[in-house]
Amino acid sequence: MTNYIYNEDGDAVGFWEDNLIFAMNGRPVGQLNGPSVHKLTGEYVGELYEDMVVDRYFEDIDRIPPTPVRRAEPAKNPGNRGATSYGYPDVFEQLLD
């Protein structure tokens, strides 16, 4: 089963396997350290919360070591799940910088 990541509009923008986050095309874009989301370089971005990458306003989250990456098979788009907001800004796009 694919673990999708959605944006505020409800569109699937990525997915995660093990500790890696991928764009829908299979390109690795980030890594997980528990619920904390980091760029591949180790820089903190936000938290995985309710299948979204959001800024929960945590401060002083340390960088983590860069991780070896692999490309994944592109994910099939599950369709829109409906717009959802949990009161935290969606920051998935920061992984694509």
Residue ranges and their predicted role:
Residues I21, V37-K39, V53-D55:
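Generic recognition of long tandem-repeat/solenoid scaffolds
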Residues M1-N3, E43-D97:
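Long terminal segments
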Residues M1-A23:
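N-terminal leader/targeting segments and the first structural element of proteins
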